Amino acid sequence: MEDSRLVVGAATDPGPVREQNEDAVYHNVLVDTPGNELTILAVADGMGGYQRGEIAAQMAIDTLIERFTSADTDDIVLMLKQAFRLANERIFADGSAEGEHNMMGTTLVVGVVRGNDLVIGNVGDSRAYLVRANSLNQISTDHSLVAEQVAMGAMTQDEARESHHKNIITRALGHRQRVEVDIFELTLLPDDRLLISSDGLHDYLEDDEMVELMLQMSPEDSAREMVARAIQAGSTDNVSALVAWAAPVSVLDAPPPVAAGEPAGANRMITILVLVGLVIFIAIIGYILLMT
C-alpha cells in the first residue's frame, strides 16, 4: 500500500443493560517478512447463557490469531477458511461437552489487509462495510432470518429492522459441526474506509450518520462516537465498532495546519521583528556609550 497507510481505531461497550460484554474486537499488524505486513481486523459477537457467549467470541479470536501467527502459506483466503473451520470445531466441541443447555456460538467478521488487497471472511450477522467516495456499501451478507426474508422479497429493509425476529441468525460458529464461511476479495483505494461492527451498532445507526462520522473523525474517535450514539439511540446489546482508514500518504506526511486566524508566516515574521528590535536596541546602547 505505497500510496496509503492503514490507520485503525476500535471501540466496544457492554451497553446499558448487559453486565458482560460478549463482543470481542481485535486488530493487529503481523509482519511475515520485511515489507510483507498483514493487518488483521476482527469483530466477534458471542451468544449463549452463563457467559458462554463471551467465551465463544474469545475462542474465535484466539483461533484466528493462532492460525495467522503460525502461517505456513501466503494464501490469505485459505488461512481464513482454516481459521473459521477450526474455530467452529473448537466452539462446537466445547459447547457440546457441557450439554445442550450450555451450547454457545459466535458471529465472526474478519478483514485481512496486505498491500492494497482486502479479504473479508464472515459468518453471522456482524457486518463489514466499505466507505468509498462518500458512499457506504455493505460487503458482507447477513446470515439471519430477516435477511433471508428481505432477499426473497417477503420483507422490506425497514420491516427487517423493526422485526421481533431480527436477532435470529441462520449461521454461526459453534452451532453445527461444520460451517460455511463467506469470502469477499476487494482492492483498497487511497482514502477508503472499512467498518466492521456488531449488530448492537449497525441496527441503531443510519448509514448516513456512520459515513459522516467516519469522514469527519479519526478512526479511533469515529469508532467511539458511533458506539456512544448507538447506545443513545436505544441499543440494549453489546456495541462494537472497528474502523480502518487507508490514509493517503500525502495527507499523513503533510505539515500540521496553522492555527485558525494565524497567517502561515506569522511566527517567522514575529521572530524577524524581535531580531530587528534587538539590533536597534544594541545600536542605541552603543551610540550612548560612545557619546559619554
Language model features with spans:
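PP2C/PPM-type serine/threonine phosphatase catalytic domain
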Residues: 1-292
